[in-house]
Amino acid sequence: MDLGEHYPCLNVQDLARSIEFYQKLDFTIIGDHRSDNWAVLQHNNMALCLYQGHIDENLINFRGGDVQAIHNEASARGLAFIKPPRLEPDGSWSAEIRDPDGNSIYFNTFPDEREQYLRTSKLIDY
């Protein structure tokens, strides 16, 4: 099952403070959306998403995969989704599942991301 690329997403209380912390660990900003209270940072081949006020909990986000196909295959293996696949107002498809410990696994793919992922097998150049 091809889930796409994965990114840890952290719910932060103070975006500026969190960015400063991660920059001290040699992360660099590759997606600067501070005006909307979120940012994407990179360290080597890892991307880290920081959100202030956009998500309720820390999660793993998979992007680029076929959300409906992931749902169908995972469901056939007995996994239950807490949010089945749906088309979001922004044009992306999303679904959500929890692991046995309650951790959120979020699948979210925009049409252009799917096409790019199919062509290159990646969404971010590291």
Placement of each model-derived feature along the sequence:
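Vicinal oxygen chelate
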Residues: 13-15, 61-104, 109
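Core segments of cupin and vicinal oxygen chelate
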Residues: 2, 9-47
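Short acidic/glycine-enriched loop/turn segments that link adjacent beta-strands
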Residues: 34-37, 56, 88-93
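Active-site beta-strand termini and strand-to-loop segments that position acidic
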Residues: 40-45, 52-53, 97-100, 110
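N-terminal beta-strand motif that seeds the catalytic metal site of vicinal oxygen chelate
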Residues: 1-16, 58-60, 110-126
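Conserved catalytic-core motifs of eukaryotic protein kinase domains, centered on the activation segment
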Residues: 33-34, 52, 118
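A short, structure-level motif marking secondary-structure boundaries and short turns
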Residues: 2-5, 23, 54-57, 83-84
